[in-house]
Amino acid sequence: MGSKEFYGGIEKSPNRSFLKAMGLTDKDISNGLVGVGVAWSESGPCNIHALSLGNKAAEGVSHSGMTPRLFATPLVIDGMAMGNEGMRYSLPSREVIANTVELTIKGHGFDAFVGISGCDKTTPGMLMGAARINVPSIVMYGGSTLPGYYMGKKIAVGDVYEAVGSYQAGRMTVEELKIMENSAVPTAGACGGLYTANTMAFMSEGLGMALTGSASPPAVDSGKTKFAFETGAAIKTLVENDIKPRDVMTYEAFENAITLLMASGGSTNVVLHLLAIAHEAHVNIKLDDFDRIGNKVPEIVNMKPGGPYTMAELNEIGGVPVVMKKLLDKGFLHGDVLTVTGKTLRENLNEIKILNIKQDIVYDIERPKMRTGGIKILRGNIAREGSVFKASASSVMKHTGPAKVFDGEEAAFRALMDNKIERGDVIVIRYEGPKGGPGMREMLAVTAAVVGKGFDRDVALITDGRFSGATRGIMIGHVAPEAFVGGEIALLKDGDVITIDGENGLLKASVSDEEFNRRRESWRPPEPKYSTGYLSQYAKLVGSASRGAVLE
């Protein structure tokens, strides 16, 4: 039901009175109403500029001949919540954002949706909401921060997390750490590396839901403001041609997005998010699809944390379209899929020119960074439903060692700080899954400390929780089934030998089925951590990470 049904006719005079109280005219109302959703907050720098971009998008909507209505969505700044109780709210915020889009658009009879996103969960939340309401929709990522500098070297906030471990290991002074802290995030915008926010920005173009080239301009770049206006203006074409999100986000579009994820070596969180968006779009993709595509697509993007570059530098050579053009030209993408431009992906990329310059930000397909995709799906007797490994950010593909088991992130972090972790160990952090956490926290404080102590080649970590996109090293997340529901990770003990084999997709413990069954007899699920509030509700409804951790 759109604005004509909500506000048309004599009987809807009272409804129109509310619109006219805000200065709208009959013509404004008859032009059609577009909800412009902005993930804006003063909670952190990732989204502090988003309101100005939302206003510019609203100008574009007006310029197209439709009437914009701005609204805000809530958000959680992952980097600020990291290592704290607040991180439990990060993944659940994705569902709240999707719900906010649905409530606002459907609750007010808006005809279309324009989304301006930013930090990690805002882009997937908006795409989930768009797929669910299935009215003409378009999104634009608000952009990342510019690189910071430390002693003449470009840095991002992930370097500060690792510096904490370096300080604890005596490899950095507190004064040096403070200098890095003060300079890592110099402007508004999301984290600059190919972490979750920027990987989801890649996905917005890969799915066809954002204008070509709109993802990469930094938050403070004038190009981002231009794209905000053009994004708003583009909604009229979508409405006139009745192009809806499920017309764009097809199975082939998701294959394109997974291909782009593998070629970029982006954040493992995006596996969760693509599964969740597909769920809302009624598209059946599974972890097997990531495995299948990842085994044939080379990794060609050389950005942090697996490389030295940031989104700002990718933008200098043409942005995400350069990556997609290289993939399309070699037959890795479906070129005939529809996009929010009203054109096919191939038509959009036909206009893209790859600069003939010497650079190592995006490799050629023939000479890739890795022969296969940057994310591996691992399975075995402690991950029967699967787990994820960011191979692009690890120089080690195989590791075998004794388990040191911790119930929760804090216990593992204390063990690291107390020098109780030795080279060769496999840290196991459990009861951090979607239900058990609840909220499936990211383990960046621990993983960064592992790297900061110089253990990134010698210590592995497995968890039913998540990892920040800034994570690097031998880190395996999303282990499913999770501990809280009785997954085998709940049955591991100190000293169990864990084998990680990224090349062959294997994650297993040297524990027989019979021994696991014996241990299960004495296992009991822990009491839920929350009995009231949103996290209590979330824990009751959320499903497995292997299905995107959606509410079921």
UniProtKB/Swiss-Prot annotation:
It catalyses: (2R)-2,3-dihydroxy-3-methylbutanoate = 3-methyl-2-oxobutanoate + H2O; (2R,3R)-2,3-dihydroxy-3-methylpentanoate = (S)-3-methyl-2-oxopentanoate + H2O. Gene3D superfamilies: IlvD/EDD C-terminal domain-like. Keywords: 2Fe-2S, Amino-acid biosynthesis, Branched-chain amino acid biosynthesis, Iron, Iron-sulfur, Lyase, Magnesium, Metal-binding. It comes from the Archaea. [2Fe-2S] cluster binds at C46, C119, C191. Binds 1 [2Fe-2S] cluster per subunit. This cluster acts as a Lewis acid cofactor. GO terms for biological process: isoleucine biosynthetic process; L-valine biosynthetic process. Pathway: Amino-acid biosynthesis; L-isoleucine biosynthesis; L-isoleucine from 2-oxobutanoate: step 3/4; Amino-acid biosynthesis; L-valine biosynthesis; L-valine from pyruvate: step 3/4. Its EC number is 4.2.1.9. The modification N6-carboxylysine is found at K121. It is an enzyme of class 4 (lyase). The active site is at S468. Mg(2+) binds at D78, D120, K121, E442. Its cofactor is [2Fe-2S] cluster; Mg(2+). GO terms for molecular function: 2 iron, 2 sulfur cluster binding; dihydroxy-acid dehydratase activity; magnesium ion binding. InterPro entries: DHAD_IlvD/Edd, Dihydro-acid_dehy_C, DihydroxyA_deHydtase, DiOHA_6PGluconate_deHydtase_CS, ILV_EDD_C, ILV_EDD_N, IlvD/EDD_N. PANTHER family: DIHYDROXY-ACID DEHYDRATASE DAD, DIHYDROXY-ACID DEHYDRATASE, MITOCHONDRIAL. Functions in the biosynthesis of branched-chain amino acids. Catalyzes the dehydration of (2R,3R)-2,3-dihydroxy-3-methylpentanoate (2,3-dihydroxy-3-methylvalerate) into 2-oxo-3-methylpentanoate (2-oxo-3-methylvalerate) and of (2R)-2,3-dihydroxy-3-methylbutanoate (2,3-dihydroxyisovalerate) into 2-oxo-3-methylbutanoate (2-oxoisovalerate), the penultimate precursor to L-isoleucine and L-valine, respectively. Homodimer. Belongs to the IlvD/Edd family. This is Dihydroxy-acid dehydratase. The gene is ilvD.
